A protein has these predicted regions:
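Solvent-exposed, non-transmembrane regions of membrane-associated and secreted proteins
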Residues: 4-219
Length: 219
């Protein structure tokens, strides 16, 4: 999930940011035109998915076909939840400190990570709630986009915001740490807590470890 030894030209980054703004604008327009009843239903499905994750004790590192089937919501799979429009955007992330605003996509495929932030399947959907822990991945150093390149500037006490449909969630950074890739398996939901962890590769250009920015919801 890392790009090695690449820098982003300013022109390419500007074009990619314009694309990201268009994707977010399309998402905002789609959800604004949606009936309130439909928005509420989509969020309720996501809440039920998160409740199932917690109740069944399923984590991303043990996600097989049986677990995916157990997590179906009224026959809907993970990829079918929180779909406000056809692009696959489930919401967007804003980090004011580093002037970042990125769409959030289902999964951590290269396609998703080249365009924005990827949500790690098998972790809580980023809609908040007790005993939830959403994990969001982003690239650093893509040749065409800045993405999570400046994530290391975040410090304890800083905040970031996630918007999914008409639900706006604010998280405060509680801890930053650097771990080995295999140590991500310890990221699980904690009872009664509402958490999000942002993940990218580090050191920049080496990418042997993962930088984790842990946040807990404050409003």
């Amino acid at each position: 999930m890392c790009i090695r030894d690449r820098l982003y030209p300013s022109g390419s980054n500007w074009m990619e940011q314009a694309k990201q703004r268009r994707q977010i604008a399309a998402y905002q327009e789609a959800q604004a035109q949606m009936e309130q009843k439909k928005r509420a239903a989509l969020l309720a499905e996501a809440d039920r998915y998160n409740q199932k994750l917690a109740e069944l004790g399923i984590s991303f590192d043990m996600l097989g076909e049986a677990e995916k089937e157990a997590l179906l919501i009224d026959g809907k799979s993970y990829d079918e939840l929180l779909l406000a429009e056809d692009s696959g955007v489930m919401g967007y992330l804003e980090i004011e400190k580093i002037k970042l605003k990125l769409p959030i996509y289902h999964g951590v495929s290269e396609e998703a990570l080249e365009s924005g932030v990827g949500h790690l399947e098998g972790t809580s959907l980023p809609v908040g709630g007790e005993t939830t822990h959403a994990i969001l991945f982003g690239h650093r150093g893509l040749p065409s986009a800045k993405l999570f390149t400046d994530l290391d500037q975040l410090e304890v006490g800083d905040t970031f915001q996630i918007t999914v449909l008409d639900r706006v969630l604010v998280y405060e950074v509680t801890q930053t740490e650097v771990v080995l890739p295999e140590e991500l398996n310890g990221l699980t939901a904690e009872s009664d807590k509402d958490q999000v962890t942002l993940v990218t590769c580090t050191p920049y250009g080496v990418n042997s470890h993962r930088l984790l920015i842990h946040g807990e919801r404050v409003r």
